[in-house]
């Protein structure tokens, strides 16, 4: 899935590219991509550090969304399959 498709799926209104939901979805796509890369290249510690930074950033944004709009948080979690 490319960036434009992700934005279209998670945007709230037309032209929305920076909402919390879109940011979480884009970070999740990058995290999945880096995870696959690290399975092939386990000693790539530079990329591993980048992955940890992305995971931390996504965690903070998810926490913000959970406090701001719990219903939207549940929808995003369900769409992305992040938690139970």
Swiss-Prot record:
- Identify the InterPro entries for this entry: Ribosomal_uS15, Ribosomal_uS15_bac-type, uS15_NS1_RNA-bd_sf
Q: Which GO terms describe its molecular function?
A: rRNA binding; structural constituent of ribosome
- SMART domains given in the database record: Ribosomal_S15 (SM01387)
State the Gene Ontology BP annotations: translation
Keyword tags: Ribonucleoprotein, Ribosomal protein, RNA-binding, rRNA-binding
Question: Which domain of life does the UniProt lineage start with?
Answer: Bacteria
Q: What Pfam families does the annotation carry?
A: Ribosomal_S15 (PF00312)
GO CC annotation: cytosolic small ribosomal subunit
- SUPFAM superfamilies in the record: S15/NS1 RNA-binding domain (SSF47060)
Its family remark reads: Belongs to the universal ribosomal protein uS15 family.
Q: How does it assemble?
A: Part of the 30S ribosomal subunit. Forms a bridge to the 50S subunit in the 70S ribosome, contacting the 23S rRNA.
Q: What does this protein do, in the record's words?
A: One of the primary rRNA binding proteins, it binds directly to 16S rRNA where it helps nucleate assembly of the platform of the 30S subunit by binding and bridging several RNA helices of the 16S rRNA. Forms an intersubunit bridge (bridge B4) with the 23S rRNA of the 50S subunit in the ribosome.
Question: Which NCBIfam families does the entry link to?
Answer: S15_bact (TIGR00952)
What name is this protein filed under? Small ribosomal subunit protein uS15
The organism's taxonomy opens as:
Bacteria, Thermotogati, Thermotogota, Thermotogae, Thermotogales
- What's the gene? rpsO
């Amino acid at each position: 899935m490319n960036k434009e498709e992700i934005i279209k799926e998670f945007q709230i209104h037309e032209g929305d590219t920076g909402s919390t939901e879109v940011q979480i979805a884009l970070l999740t796509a990058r995290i999945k991509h880096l995870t696959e890369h690290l399975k092939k290249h386990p000693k790539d510690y530079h990329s591993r550090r980048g992955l940890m930074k992305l995971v931390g950033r996504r965690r903070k944004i998810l926490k913000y969304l959970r406090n701001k709009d719990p219903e939207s948080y549940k929808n995003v979690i369900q769409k992305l399959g992040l938690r139970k």
